[in-house]
């Protein structure tokens, strides 16, 4: 019977001593790759959450409006905060069926309630971040956005809180905001000039 030819492609790996420099190097590389993957996944998750929020706002904009007032922006945020109401009602209907002993979709219901609570706290606190629909130029850029995440930095964001809805004199607030926006735009331009050089 003929002998099988030795397989040259199969090479046995050398056993590495656990305390050697090579083992430490491989461990460092593995940790570095894990850290890169974790950061990449966290960034992708953050971008997808922001993308979903922006997509919701873009689909609920009034096409005839050239710019929104802060009061109208607050009304839009209120409808954004109630976006899960129909899903919560469906979950409640499923759970109210007679004979069911366990709650169905309990984890989804918990996630939705936590999200709504967190967003409501942001809105009543220092403000929830939405696309800048108060400024007509930024609103036009936002409407032209094609949901590409690479173009996300082009969209200007603004924090709006419930105190904007409760402000007594809208004219004073708007006049002050125009001056503030001019200062912010000049600061943005100076920062971009510094970054280019």
From Swiss-Prot:
Role this protein plays: Involved in the biogenesis of the 60S ribosomal subunit in the nucleus.
Record's subcellular location: Nucleus
GO CC annotation: nucleus
UniProt region (Disordered), positions on chain: 1-38, 168-197
Keyword NAD: no
Annotated InterPro entries: Tma16, Tma16_sf
Keyword terms of this UniProt record: Nucleus, Ribosome biogenesis
Family: Belongs to the TMA16 family.
Listed name of the protein: Translation machinery-associated protein 16
Keyword Magnesium (UniProt): no
GO molecular function, one term: preribosome binding
Regions of compositional bias (Basic and acidic residues) in chain numbering: 28-38
Gene: tma16
Predominant place of localization: nucleus
SUBUNIT field: Associates with pre-60S ribosomal particles.
Bias (Acidic residues): 178-197
Natural source organism: Xenopus tropicalis (Western clawed frog)
GO biological process, alphabetically ordered: ribosomal large subunit biogenesis
